[in-house]
Amino acid sequence: MCGIIGYIGTRPATPILIGGLKRLEYRGYDSAGLALLDAQGLTTFKAVGKVARLVEKLRGDLAPEKHESYTVGIAHTRWATHGAPTEINAHPHFDKSRKICVVHNGIIENYRAIREKLQSEGHKFDSDTDTEALSRLIGVHYHGDLRLAVVKALQQVEGAYGIAVLCADEPNKIVVARKGSPLVIGMGDGECLVASDASALVAHTQRVIYLDDGDIGVITPDSVDIRNQDDEPISRDVSELGLDIGAVEKGGFEHFMLKEIFEQPESVRNALRGRINTTEGNALLAGMNISPTELAQIQRIVLVGCGTSLHAGMVGEYAFEDVSGISAEVQQAAEFRYRNPLVDHHDLVIAISQSGETADTLAAIRKAKEKGTMILGLVNVVGSAIARETGRGVFIHAGPEISVASTKAFTGQVAVLLLMALKLGRGRRLSQEHGLD
């Protein structure tokens, strides 16, 4: 439950980074930090507790006139996994020369082996984190090309990561990379941003690029260069966020959960709008894209998800059996991915996720693909990893859900699952006698 925001452009970076961190507070965290870069090099600030504590440190330690000189920076909210919630363990973390710094979401699984090797070579670690093993490893590989150093370091890393990297010797760029932890690049006029969640970008741009696993990008004020792990240039689509700033603000409510409870009627309307053919009593879900041949071969539906999405699937299970006349079951994605699930081309797997980035659900999709199974996605976020991985499915159009406790996303998921059950049922020529009306 960490957050990343980065900025490079011509505007003062500090307020943009702090504003981004505040948009990411909903993810939960125990400390925060940022790194700013100018001609004099890197400057970092860290604080335990709320982002407000970090703001206090900035006000106390950074002269007001200095704010204008920093037009490049990266920032992070941390939820402790390796090491206690202390300032030393807060991000960003440096390499040995203290010219390279990194913010990181995810877990470096082989960090102990990397740490021990580097210690044997004379490195003295400042923190207890897995991230510092990565930042120092990047420094070891740095010989004037930050992107190449990141590529080489990541080739030695096992685990999940979403990272943003700064180097004092290359102040005109931020290097970013993703594997198993979401990152999205935002593009403005003469500026670029990167964040772990699009909600941190909505105040600055509507034009975004969602990175895929294995992508390594270099962003400058005027360009985005994305390559794969073999250093080959690749193209990623530019998407429109389609969000306004009001969607990620409380709007007069005491907290986001209360706001989102009251948004449920509208979110259900959005989920159903334009998707019901009242004349024929059918659902219009072109995104499912299931041919009559594929529909005829479905013998079982397997709904996979985690948390709230898993519970939405439990409701959907009854609907598919009752309305579609197809055997259905619900499985925890975190367990499905580690088993040898008995699924094949006669099964339909429906992967449910609000964010479209749930790591266990993504892994479950890939496991199902290995078995030759048909897969549909049911997600809220357009352009998310699950939407791209499945290639077909349905969006719930609930808008951003900031509260950790899901409300409108759950009701939207249930509404769309009922539509999907209706669509499959009508496709199998079930009628009134079978309980559809």
Predicted regions and their residues:
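Hydrophobic face of alpha-helices
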Residues: 131, 135, 147-150, 258, ...
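Internal active-site segments that recognize and position negatively charged phosphoryl groups
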Residues: 255, 259, 309
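Acidic-histidine catalytic/liganding microenvironments
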Residues: 264-265, 323
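Glycine-rich phosphate-binding loops that contact phosphosugars or nucleotide phosphates
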Residues: 296-436
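Conserved short alpha-helical segments that host acidic/polar catalytic motifs at enzyme active sites
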Residues: 1-255, 263, 269-302, 338
